[in-house]
């Protein structure tokens, strides 16, 4: 191996473990230069004389307010730091003033040692006042850090000023203290801003344009790839219109998380721009509507990708050669409803609609490309960043160079908008005309139609969102052209966005991201880029958030209180002295006057009691909401007072000062976290940082040979600061890196500046500070109100389950049969959007907690296996929330025909399905939070959803009986077992779940059913049904994973402990003669060892969509052992039981000429078994309401091969026992 190849290998290995891009390298360079210059200023005596009594604060503040971020982030950090300095300095001077008053008039004449000897009591009282002020400051510091991590940039400088000022001698004046803790701080902040603007400036507005273009590139690519994947079923077809083959499913699924992070980063950078002065033609706020549209576009693209995933399952592409990333990405449960749909029908429809979809896709892709070009020109982004689409064979996309200043003049935006509108209308018309050519069987509600509707609705909404983007781009282009006509000098303006409206001011004051940690605040960048490193701390979700978002009882109670408070007693008689206006006062509320003394006193007492009770309720609510703030406030106060109590005791104060007690408190405050983290791991990292920094400072000082060579000393410190800034800016270990960098300069300056300590003593005292201060912080955080990551993980997963239940209830409208004007109001959608955002943040926290749990000590065995289960749980919850977002936005945009027109008929079925889902999710929520097993019985949402689909299909047949019968004559004859067999009502009507339809007025309905089912609202319901099937399937999988984590309650004894009828059915088949004569011996059934062994026993042959006996298992959520039948058939007394062929029953083989088992016996045997996943295709087909005999290949209806698979399994078990 040559030297060059070895170096290349070493370089790749280095970049793998320590990734670094160009932006990070520039930021490290800026920060290192800034801190080095600050250290050089401390070495110059003339500059040090102007810095006051604490010149070592200059390098420290240069690290805290570092320039290694964008301009907006630096200004943001500077504003927060200055705010903390001002209030901290004022608070410290006030506390010292009161302490000096206790010393009397001699406070400025005597030293602290003399005060200790001459005025001990006064000196002790003054230190007691300082201690009280210190405790109040520490509690406020912890409270503010717990309220919002944004405020860490304010309260940390406040702590530094107050803590260090209280350590200074009490005989120093207020002017000396103000100079010591203002000049170096303000100089360090000014230097950071200077180097941020001079050396590699990063303007947020320019970065905003680049980020928006990058996000639109990914969105554009995802749209093209997903549409190509869906309609290009046969990539080898010569009539294929695309020049590229479809990408793999794995790559398509990975794009969802990528586009989500890109769009979120756009919003973050937009909020960061409010701190900047921008000199440009167009204000950055012009991108706000585009970014909002991109967020909605992300939801529709996720819907497109999900439909591609369903199509992949339906077309059974697993029979073909799969790419490795396809196999890795397709981690789906086996019992997918879509796998039982008819692929031929879907392919037939796609083949018809292929040209229509392609035409709109091509126009939409071209408009997206033009929009990116215009935005790149408007915000001075290099045109080379814009990616064009080259997957169209007849595509003619223009390309431009970077110096194309006349770019907008070559593009007619309005013409492109008109083309897109026309293409959208043509797509709707052609789609309607093409679909009208099919028979009603294809148009009826089915899994194929659900899949197609989901794709078409998301596709159209994507085109509508592109149209909205084009309108916004047109306004930006017009604004840019107007400003350009004024010339370069007058055209550009200075934009400052912080005080433009209340929203930007609120963001500036409080921030807009609840998931920001203190590390992100110190780092100054909120894009979550940690270069592959895991977070060491996570922000904890406020306890009151769950009550605000998920507690329906609280909101209802508020309404009750409000209503009760507004009730007034009616007047029964007219008060004295008010003889006039009788008609007015007779109907008015009771008015109490001064003459009614008794009533006034009674009312005043009631009002007093009500006010007192209201005050108690408010206090109780405040304490409940502020519980985590109290907890961390007490933690900070206890830890810091344990670490620094000697500074407030007269006898130990001087000793504590000599041992650098301020360092102990400084290390202790940085080791305390209001977040959940690996406490021992974080303490270890920060201890290593302090020791390494102090050792590097010692090395630098020794290399300078006792300050004889300060140049070499400075150069060596640079090599120690570079890795520190790398860990500060490029990894989540921010506070460990801060302590390491500060320790380098603090240890050196303690020996360089006039003091009694040499360099070795300073190194030892710094190590003592991390051992004592960090140890105290560790003890307090472990034993005083500890937070455990594994408990927080369960809480977050439980919270997400509650969010899903609440979103499902908000998504459902009209569950009581009432008439609703809109199926999704704006208010409900805003609530769903808010809950969805909180749930996604909770999932991000759960992912971090999952990694942190490995660092915690555990006594219950290894955590590795449980971590894999939690990984799957988080993934499934994310998929559920993603699909609820999609269907909610689709319903808001298009409505729902079933809710708005059929709700009076189908609402009991909708209510049962929604209630089942909500019940399941609430049961999971309580199981996770309480760590209790699941109950024995849980409702089946899958069956409820199938019944809803069947009822909608039946309602359509009742609404249009004549048209459907005419269309059905051309089609095949329905199967005998089909649900849609012409009956007006099914068996569930006898249970009172469905209301009879009023036949009056329906006979006059002559509308074409094709016209109805092609309405946008009905397509929206079809699309939501496809997503609802997926949601139910994921919920069942989540239920199974929950059983692994918390277990499930099972009946150990009694009738429900095992399926007794299974033994009866087995004996009826194997020993019919003995069974008839009453000589049967009950067999001992074997119970499953684990509730998840279903996949091991269902292994009789390969899976096939055309097979009559499907072997895929469907695990019902009702119990861990038994499986609920999908289609139980009641026993009919009119059937003739004499048609049994005992020979065939005993042989288990289908005869050629003999009659088989009667249909009633087979159905009855199926209904009494406890396995639903092992059904014949006839039963599955009957449930779905499809009646295609060619598709099912059910040639012999009475064949013995149609016996339930569960019955065959029992027979196989019996043979094994005999063997």
UniProtKB/Swiss-Prot annotation:
- This protein's record includes keyword Membrane: yes
Which positions carry Phosphoserine? 1167, 1198-1199
Superkingdom of the source species: Eukaryota
Compositional bias (Polar residues) at which positions?
1096-1122
Give the disulfide map: none
**Record's compositionally biased regions (Low complexity):** 575-602
Cellular component, GO, one term: endoplasmic reticulum
Region Disordered, annotated ranges? 567-602, 967-990, 1096-1125
Q: Which InterPro entries match?
A: ArAE_2_N, Brefeldin_A-sensitivity_4, IVT-Associated, Memb_transporter_dom
Q: How does it sit in the membrane?
A: Multi-pass membrane protein
Segments on the Cytoplasmic side according to the record's topology features: 1-36, 96-123, 168-183, 651-663, 706-709, 754-766, 818-1219
Residues found modified as Phosphotyrosine = 1191
Q: Where does the sequence pass through the membrane? A: 37-57, 75-95, 124-144, 147-167, 184-204, 630-650, 664-684, 688-705, 710-730, 733-753, 767-787, 797-817
Please list the residue ranges that the record places on the Extracellular side of the membrane: 58-74, 145-146, 205-629, 685-687, 731-732, 788-796
Q: Where is the composition biased (Basic and acidic residues)?
A: 969-982
Where, per UniProt, does this protein localize? Membrane
- Keywords of the record: Membrane, Phosphoprotein, Transmembrane, Transmembrane helix
Tell me what else is known: Present with 1080 molecules/cell in log phase SD medium.
Q: Which PANTHER family match?
A: 60S RIBOSOMAL PROTEIN L19, AFR661WP
**Record's protein name:** Uncharacterized membrane protein YGL140C
Name the source organism: Saccharomyces cerevisiae (strain ATCC 204508 / S288c) (Baker's yeast)
């Amino acid at each position: 191996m040559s030297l060059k190849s070895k170096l290349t290998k070493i370089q790749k290995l280095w970049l793998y473990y320590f990734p670094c891009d160009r932006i990070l390298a520039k930021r490290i360079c800026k920060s290192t230069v800034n801190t080095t210059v600050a250290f050089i200023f401390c070495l110059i005596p003339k500059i040090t004389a102007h810095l006051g009594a604490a010149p070592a604060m200059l390098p420290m503040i240069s690290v805290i307010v570092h320039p290694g971020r964008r301009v907006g982030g630096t200004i943001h950090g500077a504003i927060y730091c200055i705010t903390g300095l001002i209030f901290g300095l004022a608070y410290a001077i006030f506390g010292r003033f009161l302490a000096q008053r206790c010393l009397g008039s001699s406070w400025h004449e005597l030293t602290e040692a003399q005060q200790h000897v001459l005025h001990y009591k006064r000196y002790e009282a003054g230190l007691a006042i300082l201690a009280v002020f210190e405790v109040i400051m520490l509690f406020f510091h912890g409270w503010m850090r717990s309220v919002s991590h944004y405020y860490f940039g304010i309260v940390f400088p406040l702590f530094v000023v107050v803590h260090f000022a209280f350590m200074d001698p009490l005989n120093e004046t207020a002017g000396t203290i103000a100079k010591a803790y203002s000049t170096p701080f303000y100089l360090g902040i000014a230097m950071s801003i200077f180097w941020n603007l001079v050396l590699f400036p990063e303007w947020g507005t320019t970065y905003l344009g680049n980020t928006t273009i990058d996000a639109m590139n990914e969105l554009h690519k995802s749209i093209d790839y997903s549409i190509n994947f869906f309609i290009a079923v046969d990539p080898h077809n010569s009539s294929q219109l695309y020049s590229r083959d479809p990408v793999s499913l794995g790559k398509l699924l990975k794009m969802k998380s990528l586009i989500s992070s890109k769009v979120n980063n756009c919003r973050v950078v937009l909020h960061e721009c409010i701190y900047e002065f921008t000199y440009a033609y167009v204000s950055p706020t012009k991108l706000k509507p585009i970014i909002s549209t991109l967020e909605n576009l992300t939801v529709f693209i996720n819907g497109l990708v999900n439909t591609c995933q369903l199509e992949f399952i339906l077309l059974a592409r697993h029979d073909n050669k799969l790419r490795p990333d396809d196999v890795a990405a397709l981690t789906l449960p086996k019992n997918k409803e879509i796998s039982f749909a008819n692929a031929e029908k879907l392919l037939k429809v796609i083949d018809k609609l292929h040209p229509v979809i392609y035409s709109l896709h091509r126009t939409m892709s071209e408009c997206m490309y033009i929009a990116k070009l215009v935005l790149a020109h408007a915000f001075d982004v290099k045109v080379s960043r814009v990616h064009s689409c080259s997957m169209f064979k007849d595509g003619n996309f223009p390309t431009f160079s970077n110096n194309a200043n006349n770019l907008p003049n070559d593009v007619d935006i309005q013409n492109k908008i008109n083309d897109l509108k026309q293409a959208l209308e043509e797509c709707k018309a052609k789609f309607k005309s093409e679909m009208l050519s099919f028979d009603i069987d294809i148009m009826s509600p089915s899994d194929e139609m659900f899949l197609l509707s989901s794709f078409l609705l998301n596709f159209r909404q994507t085109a509508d969102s592109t149209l909205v983007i084009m309108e916004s781009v047109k306004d930006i282009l017009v604004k840019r052209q107007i400003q350009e006509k004024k010339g370069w000098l007058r055209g550009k303006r200075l934009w400052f966005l912080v005080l433009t409206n209340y929203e930007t001011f609120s963001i500036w004051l409080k921030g807009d991201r609840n998931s920001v940690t203190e590390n992100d605040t110190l780092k100054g960048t909120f894009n979550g880029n940690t270069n592959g490193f895991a977070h060491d701390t996570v922000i904890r979700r406020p306890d009151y958030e769950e009550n605000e978002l998920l507690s329906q009882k609280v909101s209802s109670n508020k309404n009750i209180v409000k209503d009760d408070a507004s009730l007034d007693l009616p007047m029964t008689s007219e008060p004295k002295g008010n003889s006039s206006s009788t008609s007015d006062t007779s109907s008015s509320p009771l008015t109490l006057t001064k003459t009614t003394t008794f009533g006034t006193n009674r009312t005043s007492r009631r009002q007093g009691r009500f006010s007192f009770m209201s005050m108690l309720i408010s206090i109780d609510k405040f304490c409940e909401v502020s519980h985590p703030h109290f907890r961390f406030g007490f933690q900070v106060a206890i830890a810091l007072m344990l670490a620094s109590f000697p500074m407030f005791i007269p006898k130990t104060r001087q000793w504590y000062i000599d041992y650098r007690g301020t360092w102990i408190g400084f290390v202790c405050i940085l080791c305390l976290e209001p977040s959940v983290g690996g406490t021992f791991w974080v303490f270890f990292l920060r201890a290593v940082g302090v020791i390494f920094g102090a050792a590097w400072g010692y090395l630098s000082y020794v290399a300078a040979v006792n300050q004889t060579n300060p140049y070499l000393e400075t150069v060596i410190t640079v090599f120690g600061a570079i890795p520190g800034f790398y860990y500060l800016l490029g990894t989540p270990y921010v506070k460990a890196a801060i302590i390491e960098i500060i320790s380098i300069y603090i240890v050196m300056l303690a020996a360089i500046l006039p003091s009694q300590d040499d360099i070795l003593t300073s190194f030892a005292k710094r190590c003592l500070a991390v051992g004592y201060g960090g140890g105290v912080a560790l003890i307090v955080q472990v034993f005083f109100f500890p937070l455990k990551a594994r408990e927080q993980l369960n809480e977050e997963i439980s919270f997400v389950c509650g969010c899903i239940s609440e979103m499902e209830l908000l998504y459902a409208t009209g569950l009581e049969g009432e008439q609703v004007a809109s199926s999704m109001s704006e208010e409900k959608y805003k609530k769903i959007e808010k809950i969805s955002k909180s749930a996604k943040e909770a999932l991000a926290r759960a992912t971090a907690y999952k990694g942190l749990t490995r660092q915690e000590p555990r006594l219950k065995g290894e955590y590795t296996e449980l971590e894999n289960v939690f990984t799957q749980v988080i993934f499934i919850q994310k998929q559920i929330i993603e699909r609820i977002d999609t269907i909610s936005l689709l319903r808001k945009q298009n409505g729902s025909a079933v809710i708005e027109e059929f709700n009076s008929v189908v609402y009991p079925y909708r209510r049962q399905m929604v209630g089942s889902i909500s019940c399941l999710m609430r049961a999971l929520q309580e199981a996770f939070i309480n760590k209790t097993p699941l109950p024995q019985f849980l409702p089946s949402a899958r069956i409820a959803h199938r019944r809803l689909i069947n009822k909608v299909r039946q309602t359509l047949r009742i609404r249009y009986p004549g048209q459907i019968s005419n269309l059905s004559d051309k089609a095949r004859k329905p199967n005998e077992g089909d649900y849609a067999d012409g009956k007006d009502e099914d068996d569930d009507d006898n249970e009172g779940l469905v209301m009879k339809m009023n036949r009056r007025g329906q006979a006059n309905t002559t509308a074409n059913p094709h016209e109805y089912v092609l309405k946008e609202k009905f397509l929206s319901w079809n699309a939501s049904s496809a997503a609802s099937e997926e949601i139910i399937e994921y919920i069942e999988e989540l239920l199974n994973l929950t059983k692994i984590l918390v277990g499930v309650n099972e009946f150990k004894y009694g009738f429900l402990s095992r399926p007794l009828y299974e033994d009866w059915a087995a004996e009826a088949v194997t020993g019919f003669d003995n069974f008839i004569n009453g000589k049967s011996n009950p067999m001992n059934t074997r119970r499953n060892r684990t509730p998840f062994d279903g996949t091991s026993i269902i292994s009789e042959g390969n899976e096939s969509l055309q097979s009559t006996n499907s072997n895929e298992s469907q695990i019902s959520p009702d119990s861990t052992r038994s499986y609920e039948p999908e289609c139980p058939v009641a026993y009919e007394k009119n059937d003739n039981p004499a048609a049994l062929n005992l020979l065939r029953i005993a042989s288990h083989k289908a005869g050629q000429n003999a009659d088989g088992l009667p249909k009633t016996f087979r159905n009855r045997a199926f209904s009494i078994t406890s396995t639903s996943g092992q059904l014949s295709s006839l039963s599955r087909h009957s449930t779905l309401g499809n009646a295609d005999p060619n598709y099912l290949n059910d040639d012999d209806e009475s064949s013995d091969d149609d016996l339930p698979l569960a019955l065959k399994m029992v027979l196989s078990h019996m043979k094994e026992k005999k063997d």
